[in-house]
């Protein structure tokens, strides 16, 4: 444990989530005192894995906070030097996108930032955004194209295609930048792509489910290319962006862009006996891969875990947590 951060108090919202759980673990390991918010501190599925973390007994405090309840974060944020706002829903099957995704992302972010504006101790906010807020603007993404932090997703363009998660992250990040400019808050954003790697929480999350589907008997793999990144690298990037005084703006996090066919190929090499999908879900040409700039991530001092290792860690974790019966 690093002793240099003792007395350094930070808040993590949505602490029971996939990225946030790792963030809490790494912050505790580095000596921080963590004030963590969850929707229900009495739900063992939300908090048991957090209270068992090394250092939790001494330096982790849990608070109940609802994203949509005005002022719910005021008392938690008071006295904090840093706030990591990770809380935002991520799932695809939505009936009411406004209520299920957009309101919690947008209003929730502004609610947390509003509390930050009232806290004189606050030095910096790190916002968990997404590559979803960067790369979806109708511009072609082909192998010679490099997506970087100057790209902004076009929310209207995405709403027409019912990409509601993408819309929610885009509107939330746009509103956050506007708010922090007006209120003179120092904020940086972390914009990861598809996050995989080991699970600390007992509940299956959306991005790990993408790997689970491939190893649990799917007949086909999706015709899609995504950026992939390890959850531990994402959590680490949040802390580096907080600690590194010169960090600013947005930080895309992608170790590699790979088509699902490539992910299946890696799985086949790692686990030759697995029943894996042989064919693509459609007969169209494969959606091309593209590049994502690593410059901003490098400026934080971040080193990436290779995709092969991340995939293996994900499968081993899914086995250990009994999601996959291999």
Curated annotation (Swiss-Prot):
Its EC number is 1.2.1.44. Changing residue 169 to A: Impaired activity. Keywords: Cytoplasm, NADP, Oxidoreductase. The keyword Cytoplasm applies. It catalyses: (E)-cinnamaldehyde + NADP(+) + CoA = (E)-cinnamoyl-CoA + NADPH + H(+); (E)-coniferaldehyde + NADP(+) + CoA = (E)-feruloyl-CoA + NADPH + H(+); (E)-4-coumaraldehyde + NADP(+) + CoA = (E)-4-coumaroyl-CoA + NADPH + H(+). (E)-coniferaldehyde binds at residues 130, 136, 141, 165, 194, 207, 226, 257, 290. Pathway: Aromatic compound metabolism; phenylpropanoid biosynthesis. Pfam families: Epimerase (PF01370). Changing residue 165 to A/F: Impaired activity. InterPro entries: Epimerase_deHydtase, NAD(P)-bd_dom_sf, NAD(P)_dehydrat-like. Its main location: cytoplasm. The keyword Oxidoreductase applies. One of its GO terms (molecular function) is cinnamyl-alcohol dehydrogenase activity. It comes from the Eukaryota. GO terms for biological process: phenylpropanoid biosynthetic process. Changing residue 136 to F: Increase activity with sinapaldehyde as substrate. Strongly increase activity with sinapaldehyde as substrate. NADP(+) binds at residues 14-20, 39, 46, 66-67, 86-88, 165, 169, 192-195, 207. GO terms for cellular component: cytoplasm. The active site is at residue 169. Belongs to the NAD(P)-dependent epimerase/dehydratase family. Dihydroflavonol-4-reductase subfamily. Involved in lignin biosynthesis. Regulates the monolignol composition by catalyzing the conversion of cinnamoyl-CoAs into their corresponding cinnamaldehydes. Can use coumaraldehyde and coniferaldehyde as substrates, but barely sinapaldehyde. This is Cinnamoyl-CoA reductase CAD2. It comes from Medicago truncatula. The gene is CAD2.
């Amino acid at each position: 444990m690093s002793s240099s951060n003792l007395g350094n108090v930070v808040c993590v919202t949505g602490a029971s989530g996939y990225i946030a759980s790792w963030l809490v673990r790494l912050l505790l390991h580095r000596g921080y005192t963590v004030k963590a918010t969850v929707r229900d501190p009495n739900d063992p599925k939300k908090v048991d894995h957090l209270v068992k973390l090394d250092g939790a007994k001494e330096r982790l405090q849990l608070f109940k906070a609802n994203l949509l309840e005005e002022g719910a974060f005021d008392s938690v944020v008071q006295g904090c030097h840093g706030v990591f706002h990770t809380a935002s829903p991520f799932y695809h099957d939505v009936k009411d996108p406004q209520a299920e995704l957009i309101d919690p992302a947008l209003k929730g972010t502004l609610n947390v930032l509003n509390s930050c504006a009232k806290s004189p101790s606050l030095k910096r906010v790190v916002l968990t955004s997404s590559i979803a807020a960067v790369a979806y603007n109708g511009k072609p993404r082909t192998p010679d194209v490099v997506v970087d932090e100057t790209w902004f997703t076009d929310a209207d363009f995405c709403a027409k295609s019912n990409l509601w998660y993408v819309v929610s992250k885009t509107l939330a990040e746009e509103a956050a930048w506007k708010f922090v400019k007006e209120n003179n808050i120092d904020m940086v954003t972390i914009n990861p792509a598809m996050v995989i790697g080991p699970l600390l929480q007992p509940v299956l999350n959306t991005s790990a489910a993408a790997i689970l589907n491939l190893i649990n008997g799917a007949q086909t793999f999706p015709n899609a290319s995504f950026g992939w990144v390890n959850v531990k690298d994402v959590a680490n990037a949040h802390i580096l962006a907080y600690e590194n005084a010169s960090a600013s703006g947005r930080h895309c996090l992608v170790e590699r862009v790979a088509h699902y066919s490539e992910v299946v190929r890696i799985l086949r090499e790692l686990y030759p006996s697995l029943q894996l999908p042989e064919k693509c879900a459609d007969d169209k040409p494969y959606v091309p891969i593209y590049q994502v700039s690593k410059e901003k991530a490098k400026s934080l001092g971040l080193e990436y875990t290779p995709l092969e290792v991340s995939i293996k860690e994900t499968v081993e974790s899914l086995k250990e947590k009994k999601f996959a019966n291999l």
